[in-house]
């Protein structure tokens, strides 16, 4: 039996709202100041790590209490993750840092089935969470001897300039090799559930970005780790594991000519990846982060359908914002092109316009960080038609299976249900198993430990989409197009 120790670290919420503030992530209008209260669940006599495997935080948003459940993102790094920089004479200096006890988490809000969270706990809480359909960001205020944090909505980040931020290259790439085409255009419910896929990602940082952060390798590393943690969370609904395989920082000079012509830079970077980077370390996709201002208000470019190709499985992303979440959304978008996704636009008879979705051609003030149904269909079609082989196999990870920890609010190996604090009457807190006679413990289609009847509305209609309804066989509330 696993016993749980509750540790209360800090108490209270400071009920203060401000109109404007300058944060590490940029200028923000309309924010809340909170003091999160931390409650940690640990097995008795557990070996203490610097960063726990699972944590809970309580604070208020808009006057309402929320409970944020976090679990360490153990798939963030590959087991052989490496970092490379360069000596003044051009020699590669590669290290293999220990990253198992890292400080990057994913999670959700208690009692909000559609919530998500991606948080760095390295120095306070920094990241984002989705609550009741709204995306909020949180970060420490960096006040002396204070645990104060700012919470604010995505749309309240002040623009650093007024020019629209756009994706540049979305050119189709067709292989010269024979490609097996799908015999059916209709995607079956089984296809819609998305098979598990794995992308080993390489991030390259150019010299301009390195100097932008005062040649501080630690600052660059933290920024990239935060970015990839966000990206991995955004790809979870598609059943894609993004694992950071390597970080290559051009610390002495650029190893290619990085210019504002994004098409040219992307092509040259693809050549360098094929001839140099792939020979050094195996990976599936490489993206170059640059401080160079790209032409035509472009902030990112990538080859569509290029995933797994030695030259074309690449992208180029401008580090255009102090806010790492905004740059992470852009890289998520460009990886989407590598995976066959088109822009969310109305064209060729397809009604796909979605200004707030990840694959919108122009970044929105109200970014939702969701993939549209059109993007999901594009991705599934890419898998069916192109059958990319490199993303089939799971990479070695720093920690693939954790010891079950009761009370961490995320389902782990051997558990049937989430062990709540306080306990859920449908779930045995000692074993994380359903109590006798219970079919479920929670979920939009669970009521008093039993599945709701087939046809019960579990999510009301939004826009052009109809109501989502329970199946009577599960506690999940399936999207209408998964039925």
Curated annotation (Swiss-Prot):
GO MF annotations, alphabetized: metal ion binding; metalloendopeptidase activity; toxin activity
Propeptide: 21-190, 396-411
Additional free-text comment from the UniProt record: The disintegrin belongs to the medium disintegrin subfamily.
UniProt binding sites for Zn(2+): 333, 337, 343
Keyword list, A-Z: Cell adhesion impairing toxin, Disulfide bond, Hemostasis impairing toxin, Hydrolase, Metal-binding, Metalloprotease, Platelet aggregation inhibiting toxin, Protease, Secreted, Signal, Toxin, Zinc, Zymogen
Protein name: Zinc metalloproteinase/disintegrin
Every Disintegrin domain range: 403-483
Record InterPro entries: Disintegrin_CS, Disintegrin_dom, Disintegrin_dom_sf, MetalloPept_cat_dom_sf, Peptidase_M12B, Peptidase_M12B_N, Reprolysin_adamalysin
Oligomer and partners: Monomer.
Cofactor: Zn(2+)
Family from the record: Belongs to the venom metalloproteinase (M12B) family. P-II subfamily. P-IIa sub-subfamily.
Species classification: Eukaryota, Metazoa, Chordata, Craniata, Vertebrata
Location(s), subcellular: Secreted
Tissues/organs with expression: Expressed by the venom gland.
GO cellular component, one term: extracellular region
Domain spans labelled Peptidase M12B: 197-395
GO biological process: proteolysis
Cofactor note: Binds 1 zinc ion per subunit.
């Amino acid at each position: 039996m696993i016993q749980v120790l509750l540790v209360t670290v800090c108490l209270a919420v400071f009920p203060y709202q401000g109109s404007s503030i300058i944060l590490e992530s940029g200028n923000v209008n309309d924010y809340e100041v909170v003091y999160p209260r931390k409650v940690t669940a640990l097995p008795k006599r557990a070996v203490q790590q610097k960063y726990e495997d699972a944590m809970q935080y309580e604070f208020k948003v808009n006057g309402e209490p929320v409970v944020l459940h976090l679990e360490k993102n153990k798939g963030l790094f590959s087991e052989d993750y490496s970092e490379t920089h360069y000596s003044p004479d051009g020699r590669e200096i590669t290290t293999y840092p220990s990253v198992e006890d890292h400080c990057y988490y994913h999670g959700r809000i208690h009692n909000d089935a559609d919530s998500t969270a991606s948080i760095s706990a390295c120095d306070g809480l920094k990241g984002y969470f989705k609550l009741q359909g709204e995306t909020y960001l949180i970060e420490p205020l960096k006040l002396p001897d204070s645990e104060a944090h700012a919470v604010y909505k995505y749309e309240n980040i002040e623009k650093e300039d007024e020019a629209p931020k756009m994706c540049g290259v979305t050119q189709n790439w067709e292989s010269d090799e024979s490609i097996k085409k799908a015999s059916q255009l209709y995607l079956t419910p089984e296809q819609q559930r998305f098979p598990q896929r794995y992308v080993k990602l390489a991030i390259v940082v150019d010299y301009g970005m390195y100097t932008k952060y005062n040649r501080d390798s630690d600052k660059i590393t933290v920024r990239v780790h935060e970015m990839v943690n966000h990206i991995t969370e955004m790809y979870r609904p598609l059943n894609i594991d993004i694992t950071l395989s390597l970080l290559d920082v051009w610390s002495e000079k650029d190893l290619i000519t990085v210019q504002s012509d994004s098409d040219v830079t992307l092509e040259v970077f693809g050549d360098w990846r094929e001839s140099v980077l792939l020979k050094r370390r195996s990976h599936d996709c490489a993206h170059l982060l640059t401080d160079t201002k790209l032409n035509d208000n472009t902030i990112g470019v990538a080859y569509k359908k290029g995933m797994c190709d030695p030259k074309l499985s690449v992208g180029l992303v401008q580090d255009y914002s102090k806010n790492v979440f905004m740059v992470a959304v852009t890289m998520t978008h460009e990886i989407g092109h590598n995976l066959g996704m088109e822009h969310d636009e109305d064209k060729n008879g397809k009604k796909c316009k979605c200004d707030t979705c990840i694959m919108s051609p122009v970044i929105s003030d109200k970014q939702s960080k969701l993939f549209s149904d059109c993007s999901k269909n594009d991705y599934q079609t890419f898998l069916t038609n192109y059958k990319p082989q490199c993303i089939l196999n799971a990479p070695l990870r720093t920690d693939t299976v954790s010891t079950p920890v009761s009370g961490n609010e995320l389902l782990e190996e051997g558990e049937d249900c989430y062990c709540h604090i306080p306990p859920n009457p449908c779930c045995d807190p000692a074993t994380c198993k359903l109590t006798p006679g219970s079919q479920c413990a929670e979920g939009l289609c669970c009521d008093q430990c039993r599945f709701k009847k087939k046809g019960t509305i579990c999510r009301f209609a939004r826009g052009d989409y109809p109501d989502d309804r329970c199946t009577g066989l599960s506690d999940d509330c399936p999207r209408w197009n998964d039925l």
